[in-house]
């Protein structure tokens, strides 16, 4: 997940699901978590990241967002719409989780798309894994200082890592933003779960019931996704 805008069109969101108890316009200090990804497919780890961040950082809503067009690659196993169906199914029990498709795929563009959808007072936290967090911080931006300044003017980062440990590289360009980069420890049972493992198990004809919500496992079985 990288961050510098490359498109001329204004970033926008296509809503799939609005959280029944999400952020409202009259909240004084609302906090929004944003979890972007391909969700190919959604797993217990994705949901645990969102739920843990919401609890630890008092997030009033977590928005799951998929890019309409990926900046680096496209999943071959499932279409955007198929992944949206699985994700919407997984989010149904969660009244503070929303779902949208972003017209653009880069982090800063997603932040720009939020501006027209949420109150100006909302504080935004992007939720990322440790690998994505490292890429965001160390990406070879054309103008790194300017890009990082614009990013952290719009959002903080919550970085999920093993044991809640996060090592921020000692680089002068990152020093002003250390207080905006927050470590988060995932539940131990979710740390080894990934969409890659789910797909590998399905191709091998193995069970995935402990890796994804039951309704997602059932939908995948019915559709035959990821089996070849």
Segments (PLM) and residue ranges:
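Nucleotidyltransferase catalytic core that binds NTPs
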Residues: 1-228
């Amino acid at each position: 997940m990288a961050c510098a805008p490359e498109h001329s069109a204004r970033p926008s969101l296509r809503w799939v699901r609005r959280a029944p108890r999400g952020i409202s316009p009259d909240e004084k200090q609302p906090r929004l978590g944003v979890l972007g990804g391909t969700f190919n497919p959604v797993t217990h780890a994705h949901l645990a990241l969102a739920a843990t961040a919401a609890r630890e950082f008092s997030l009033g809503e977590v928005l799951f967002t998929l890019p309409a067009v990926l900046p680096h690659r496209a999943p071959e196993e499932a279409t955007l719409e198929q992944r949206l169906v699985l994700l919407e199914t997984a989010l149904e029990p969660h009244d503070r989780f929303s779902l949208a498709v972003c017209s653009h795929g880069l982090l800063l563009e997603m932040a720009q798309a939020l501006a027209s959808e949420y109150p100006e007072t909302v504080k935004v936290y992007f939720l990322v894994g440790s690998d994505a967090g490292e890429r965001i911080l160390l990406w070879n931006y054309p103008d790194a200082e300017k890009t990082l300044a614009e990013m952290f003017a719009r959002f903080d980062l919550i970085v999920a890592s093993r044991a809640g440990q996060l090592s921020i590289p000692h680089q002068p360009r990152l020093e002003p933003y250390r207080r905006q980069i927050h470590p988060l420890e995932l539940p131990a049972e979710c740390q080894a779960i990934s969409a890659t493992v789910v797909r590998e198990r399905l191709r091998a004809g193995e069970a995935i019931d402990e890796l994804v919500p039951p309704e997602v496992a059932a939908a995948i079985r019915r559709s035959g996704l990821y089996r070849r």
